[in-house]
């Protein structure tokens, strides 16, 4: 089975506070995009994982490997798989590359082994592996709350293009959250009502105005180059620019492909860049 595993961006990321268990309560609008990994899964005796296109571990520290183990634990069945991941999503970017792969494995094995697990059951299993897996399983446009386990589908964003720019460095998610500790974020919170209204009307101009990610504050402290790169993108006059997740990837929102191409070709910073569109689904089976 060949599965497309879409990446995600955060159109907004608000942090409401830290829970007693150390996790942070979030309020985030996430969007799946047409950039993604290809995950090939075949039934097997044990767990055999191969990654092409990135230097990643292929043992139990890999989220895709953990997904097989989690399904075994949840079902009590000796599920095995031979998995090949062809990486397209940049690493340490805030684009949920690992979680996208984990979601694809849960989705694929549920079908391959006829486990008949409901979407709700898959979300519950996924949440125990990674905070982004519940959204990655859902895809499209969604409001994500809690620590990532509460996912509410929103009307899909059908308009617009995004130019994704990944600098030649990553940002540690753990450090990004740690840097927020003790900061007064009272005036930093996004306008939730306005971003939901802009999305509901598919008003891209307003959406661009209200893009907000609190983790940008700490990312700028960790690596001030982010500020320079963001300004470079803003100078190219998109509708808005934001860092996705804990970074380091930035995205520029545009109203059409012509403007997206203009930004893409004028952007001469070191790193990776992509033109993508909103994607209305989660993991998608391309071939049985």
Swiss-Prot record:
KW Chloroplast (keyword) present: no
InterPro entries found in the cross-reference section: GHMP_kinase_C_dom, GHMP_kinase_C_sf, GHMP_kinase_N_dom, IspE, Ribosomal_Su5_D2-typ_SF, Ribsml_uS5_D2-typ_fold_subgr
Family: Belongs to the GHMP kinase family. IspE subfamily.
Gene Ontology process terms (BP): isopentenyl diphosphate biosynthetic process, methylerythritol 4-phosphate pathway; terpenoid biosynthetic process
Active site: 8, 132
NCBIfam families linked: ispE (TIGR00154)
Function (record text): Catalyzes the phosphorylation of the position 2 hydroxy group of 4-diphosphocytidyl-2C-methyl-D-erythritol.
This protein's name: 4-diphosphocytidyl-2-C-methyl-D-erythritol kinase
Organism listed in the record: Carboxydothermus hydrogenoformans (strain ATCC BAA-161 / DSM 6008 / Z-2901)
PANTHER family from the UniProt entry: 4-DIPHOSPHOCYTIDYL-2-C-METHYL-D-ERYTHRITOL KINASE, CHLOROPLASTIC
Pathway: Isoprenoid biosynthesis; isopentenyl diphosphate biosynthesis via DXP pathway; isopentenyl diphosphate from 1-deoxy-D-xylulose 5-phosphate: step 3/6
Molecular function as annotated in GO: 4-(cytidine 5'-diphospho)-2-C-methyl-D-erythritol kinase activity; ATP binding
Reactions this protein catalyses: 4-CDP-2-C-methyl-D-erythritol + ATP = 4-CDP-2-C-methyl-D-erythritol 2-phosphate + ADP + H(+)
Disulfide feature: none
Residues holding ATP: 90-100
Keywords: ATP-binding, Isoprene biosynthesis, Kinase, Nucleotide-binding, Transferase
Coiled coil regions, renumbered to chain: none
Gene name of this polypeptide: ispE
Residue ranges of the TM segments: none
EC number: 2.7.1.148
């Amino acid at each position: 089975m060949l599965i497309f595993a879409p990446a995600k961006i955060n159109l907004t990321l608000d942090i409401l506070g830290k829970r007693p268990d150390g996790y942070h309560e979030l309020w985030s609008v996430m969007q799946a995009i047409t950039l993604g990994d290809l995950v090939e899964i075949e039934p097997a005796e044990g767990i055999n994982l191969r990654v092409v296109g990135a230097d990643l571990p292929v043992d139990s520290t890999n989220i895709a490997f953990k997904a097989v183990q989690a399904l075994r634990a949840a079902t009590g069945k000796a599920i095995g798989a031979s998995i090949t991941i062809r990486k397209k999503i940049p690493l340490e970017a805030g684009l949920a590359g690992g979680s996208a792969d984990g979601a694809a494995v849960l989705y694929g094995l549920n079908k391959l082994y006829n486990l008949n697990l409901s979407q709700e059951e898959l979300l519950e299993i996924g949440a125990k592996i990674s905070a982004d897996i519940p959204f990655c399983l859902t895809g499209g446009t969604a409001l994500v709350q809690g620590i990532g386990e509460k996912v509410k589908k929103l009307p899909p964003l059908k308009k617009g293009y995004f130019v994704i720019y990944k600098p030649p460095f990553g940002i540690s998610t753990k450090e990004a959250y740690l840097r927020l500790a003790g900061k007064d974020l009272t005036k930093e919170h996004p306008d939730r009502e306005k971003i939901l209204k802009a999305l509901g009307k598919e008003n891209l101009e307003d959406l661009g105005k209200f893009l907000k990610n609190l983790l940008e504050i700490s990312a700028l402290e960790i690596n001030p180059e982010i500020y320079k790169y963001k300004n470079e993108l803003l100078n190219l006059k998109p509708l808005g620019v934001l860092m996705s997740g804990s970074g380091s990837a930035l995205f520029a929102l545009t109203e059409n492909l012509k403007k997206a191409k203009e930004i893409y070709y004028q952007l001469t910073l070191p790193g990776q860049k992509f033109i993508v569109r909103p994607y209305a689904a989660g993991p998608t089976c391309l071939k049985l």
